[in-house]
Amino acid sequence: MRPQQAPVSGKVFIQRDYSGGTRCQFQSKFPAELENRIDRQQFEETVRTLNNLYAEAEKLGGQSYLEGCLACLTAYTIFLCMETHYEKVLKKIAKFIQEQNEKIYAPQGLLLTDPIERGLRVIEITIYEDRGMSSGR
């Protein structure tokens, strides 16, 4: 997934957006460091999709209620043989990030890191040096 042997030229961190409370969502402001690297609309669509997926994960519904009841009735041993709704959505997020890296970010010399690896505090985007720029040195 990472561009082969390209040195890291920097990292960009997309911070959490607490304007709507403590739910997990990230700022969609386009970082200047990504200018001429990736389309602004594509970046915003990626962040919007991630925000929607995290909202889906945190949504309380019948399934979450049932999981909680089953957990109490089984002294939480139910989770040894079944995934929670939250875990299922986290897997969906990891798959989405992997697809975005393969199709959009890696070809541009970028790498999205799953926010779960950073404690859901930031979306980390690693910027790799352009081969054209680094070969001229």
Swiss-Prot record:
The keyword Lipoprotein applies. It is found in: Golgi apparatus membrane. It comes from the Eukaryota. One of its GO terms (biological process) is Golgi to plasma membrane protein transport. InterPro entries: Golgin_A_7/ERF4, Ras_palmitoyltransferase. Signal peptide: none annotated. It is a lipid-anchor. Keywords: Golgi apparatus, Lipoprotein, Membrane, Palmitate. One of its GO terms (cellular component) is palmitoyltransferase complex. It holds the Pfam family Erf4. A lipid is attached at C69, C72 (S-palmitoyl cysteine). May be involved in protein transport from Golgi to cell surface. The ZDHHC9-GOLGA7 complex is a palmitoyltransferase specific for HRAS and NRAS. Interacts with ZDHHC9. Belongs to the ERF4 family. This is Golgin subfamily A member 7. It comes from Gallus gallus.
